[in-house]
């Protein structure tokens, strides 16, 4: 059985946009670069040719990866979720119990996780510790950097 890849609507759209760009913009550009480099003659010492072929390999690998993830996507409409129990798609406001510093994270699929954008993978240590918990609970997260304790201040669905 094929393992489904959970993702939000926004995450699915972003991956689909990246796939479309790689197929319709990057692929033709790289093919043109290869043709130009090939026109320069001897391929054995043609750095432009080898660089373009390497870029083509990277691009085609990413296209295959995106096609696979999109084919296995289990799209979850977060706007239709509710409740005060944390699960996939929840946006959680945490307060560090040591520093009182506030952090906001949305729990998403691995394919769309981006810590800089406040999105963490459902398989991350933090998300695994949060799943099933409710607002007002305390949670201890054991991560590579050590153990941290947080209070769950808010659970939202957006």
Swiss-Prot record:
Pfam families hit by this protein: GreA_GreB, GreA_GreB_N
In its keyword annotation, does this UniProt entry include Transcription regulation?
A: yes
Key words, A-Z: Coiled coil, DNA-binding, Transcription, Transcription regulation
An annotated Gene Ontology molecular function: DNA binding
Query: Does Transcription appear among the keywords?
Result: yes
UniProt lists the family membership as follows: Belongs to the GreA/GreB family.
According to its UniProt entry, the function of this protein is described as: Necessary for efficient RNA polymerase transcription elongation past template-encoded arresting sites. The arresting sites in DNA have the property of trapping a certain fraction of elongating RNA polymerases that pass through, resulting in locked ternary complexes. Cleavage of the nascent transcript by cleavage factors such as GreA or GreB allows the resumption of elongation from the new 3'terminus. GreA releases sequences of 2 to 3 nucleotides.
Which HAMAP family does the record associate with it?
A: GreA_GreB
Question: Any idea what this protein is called?
Answer: Transcription elongation factor GreA
Source organism of the structure: Nitrobacter winogradskyi (strain ATCC 25391 / DSM 10237 / CIP 104748 / NCIMB 11846 / Nb-255)
Q: Encoded by which gene? A: greA
